[in-house]
């Protein structure tokens, strides 16, 4: 066995396990907690049962409050029963406590509530046990005593029978309510949260091992099977060349998916500023919430794409949201693997995250990815519209039901998850762009001839419900005049991958870039400007409230575009933003 190739051993083991599982048809998973859950999938049960920093969970704290309410409410009813007879409070206390008899006094009902309170608080709040046995004993003892009390109490000698009956029934119901709440709410929700949290904080081997032993039917769509890393290979081997080819193909697939999302028409406006910059959002099944920022930048499209893609290691110099940014593997001139560390956000609630991304960039012409020869020809000849364009593949819309995308033969196929788009009819080209910039009807192509407003107005306003009524009534200073954009779009994309050379750091939480990308659209007659569209969908891992995550992501996007404009101004001053020459 020691002389066998590790890849052969692994393949044999996977085949044996898959065949064994296929014979066990009765095996069904209720849910797969090992999959990379999005922040959007965190349930209320998890939030209620989660014990942050070792503190008491919300659901257990409510149980302790319920037990306290039991004692206080029973005591209040007892006071009403003894005072309503007309006796002085001290005389009533003397009869009920000092001269106590089980036949005439109701103080024993309060005593049972006190004992129940002390026992439950001691075991479930102080000792923090997670078993139903104690609550079962306390409830059983309380109910047995109350039932016995009904038979031995002297009801004929009582003056306020109604209140005394209410006192006993209330104590009985509260005791059973505590037992039900602990057994059906506290214990299940805390166990669910612990299981969920262990899954999210498991080591790197967990998501690499478990998906490998699941057959296709047991594996949920977009599971971590798409994101576990490859086995190490010897340097300068033939397998490295094959791996580079797979990374290249994976980058092209991710480019197409990012372009599909950018071109989709089901975006909802979230924020709009006075320069016309907009932030949209949309919801995708199995992915979560995706954001898109649209802005106009006074810089050539290709030059801006090259600066952001090829000079990524310089990004921390002008983007304060990044602590570190570097290329860890160069695959080819338009594909690489990068490592980035972001600063915290959300008022300190979102800590620093690090990301390992597979990036790719290409030129799209009429919705198709162009090869190197076509890219060079299109870049050198703007006016030739009769080119015989042999592009690598067209971008097709993927419906919600298209979930059986074949995986690459290697485990690096992390971007093979399907990004479903809306099933509605396809919008006219650039209609989304026009709507985001407030134009009434841009038709198949749009124009922008005016200069952008001053760069000191980055205040965003909530769009939400009123955006539909205001989209067609935006004033002239906020909407550039109509013009044409070229059919050429420079697109970059990024998706998270597992890369053995960059293991998770204990200093940061490893985030997941589900999908992100930029589209740089050229403008006819304005070669020194372009339209930038940025889509972003992240899984930051860990527990982050939804409203905090939304605020942090939208704020980071607006800060990024503001810093990008400042960076572009510096580039123009240095002479690096000259418009490309045309023939």
From Swiss-Prot:
Keywords: Lipid transport, Lipid-binding, Membrane, Steroidogenesis, Transmembrane, Transmembrane helix, Transport. Residues 85-104, 154-161 are extracellular. The chain crosses the membrane at residues 64-84, 105-127, 131-153, 162-182. Expressed in larval prothoracic gland cells (at protein level). Detected in larval ring gland, imaginal disk and salivary gland and in adult head, ovary and testis. Expressed in nurse cells of stage 10 egg chambers in 2-day-old adult ovary. No expression detected in adult brain. InterPro entries: MENTAL, StAR-like, STARD3, START-like_dom_sf, START_lipid-bd_dom. Residues 263-573 form the START domain. SUPFAM superfamilies: Bet v1-like. GO terms for cellular component: endoplasmic reticulum-endosome membrane contact site; late endosome membrane. It is found in: Membrane. Pfam families: MENTAL, START. It is a multi-pass membrane protein. Residues 56-227 form the MENTAL domain. One of its GO terms (biological process) is cholesterol transport. May bind to and transport cholesterol and may play a role in ecdysteroid biosynthesis. This is Steroidogenic acute regulatory protein-like. The lineage of its organism: Eukaryota, Metazoa, Ecdysozoa, Arthropoda, Hexapoda. The gene is Start1.
């Amino acid at each position: 066995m020691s002389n066998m190739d590790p890849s052969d051993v692994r393949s044999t083991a996977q085949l044996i396990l898959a065949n064994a599982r296929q014979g066990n048809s009765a095996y069904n998973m209720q849910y797969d907690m090992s999959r990379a859950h999005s922040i959007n999938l965190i349930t209320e049960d998890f939030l209620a049962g989660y014990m942050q920093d070792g503190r008491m969970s919300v659901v257990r704290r409510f149980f302790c409050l319920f037990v306290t309410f039991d004692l206080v409410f029973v005591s209040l009813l007892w006071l009403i029963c003894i005072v309503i007879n007309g006796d002085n409070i001290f005389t009533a206390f003397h009869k009920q406590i000092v001269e106590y008899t089980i036949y005439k006094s109701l103080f024993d009902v309060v005593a049972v509530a006190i004992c129940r309170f002390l026992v439950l608080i001691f075991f479930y709040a102080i000792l923090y046990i997670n078993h139903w046995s104690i609550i079962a004993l306390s409830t059983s003892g309380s109910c047995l005593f109350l039932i016995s009390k009904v038979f031995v109490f002297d009801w004929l000698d009582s003056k306020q029978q109604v209140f005394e009956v209410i006192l006993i029934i209330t104590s009985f119901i509260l005791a059973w309510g505590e037992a039900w709440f602990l057994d059906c709410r506290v214990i299940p929700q805390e166990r669910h949260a612990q299981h969920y949290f262990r899954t999210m904080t498991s080591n790197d081997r967990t998501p690499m091992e478990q998906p490998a032993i699941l057959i296709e039917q047991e594996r949920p769509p977009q599971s971590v099977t798409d994101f576990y890393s490859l086995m190490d290979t010897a340097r300068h081997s033939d397998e490295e060349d094959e791996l580079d080819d797979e990374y290249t193909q994976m980058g092209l697939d991710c480019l197409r998916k990012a372009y599909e999302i950018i071109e989709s028409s089901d975006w909802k406006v979230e924020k709009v500023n006075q320069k016309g910059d907009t932030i949209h959002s949309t919801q995708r099944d199995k992915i979560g919430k995706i954001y898109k920022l649209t802005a106009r930048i006074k810089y050539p499209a290709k030059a801006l794409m090259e600066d952001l893609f090829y000079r990524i290691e310089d990004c921390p110099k002008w983007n304060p949201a990044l602590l570190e940014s570097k290329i860890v593997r160069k695959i080819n001139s338009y594909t690489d693997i990068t490592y980035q560390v972001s600063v915290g956000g959300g008022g300190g609630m979102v800590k620093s995250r690090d990301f390992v991304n597979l990036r790719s960039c290409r030129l799209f012409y009429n919705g198709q990815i162009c090869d190197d020869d076509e890219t060079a020809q299109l870049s050198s000849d703007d006016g030739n519209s009769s080119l015989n364009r042999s592009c690598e593949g067209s971008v097709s819309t993927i419906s919600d039901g298209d979930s059986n995308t074949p995986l690459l033969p290697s485990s690096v196929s992390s971007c093979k998850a399907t990004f479903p788009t809306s099933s509605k009819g396809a919008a006219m080209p650039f209609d989304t762009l026009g709507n985001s910039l407030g134009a009434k009807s841009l038709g198949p192509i749009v124009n922008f001839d005016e200069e952008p407003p001053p760069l000191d107005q980055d205040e965003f306003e909530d769009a939400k419900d009123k955006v539909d009524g205001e989209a067609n009534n935006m004033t002239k200073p906020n909407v550039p005049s109509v013009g044409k954009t070229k059919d050429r779009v420079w697109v970059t994309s990024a998706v998270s991958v597992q890369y053995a050379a960059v293991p998770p750091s204990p200093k940061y939480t490893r985030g997941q870039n589900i999908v992100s990308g930029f589209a740089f659209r050229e403008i006819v007659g304005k070669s020194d400007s372009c339209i930038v569209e940025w889509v972003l969908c992240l899984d930051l891992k860990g527990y982050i409230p939804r409203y905090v995550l939304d605020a942090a992501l939208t704020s980071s996007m607006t800060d990024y575009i503001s810093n990008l404009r400042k960076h572009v101004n510096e580039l123009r001053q240095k002479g690096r933003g000259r418009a490309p020459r045309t023939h």
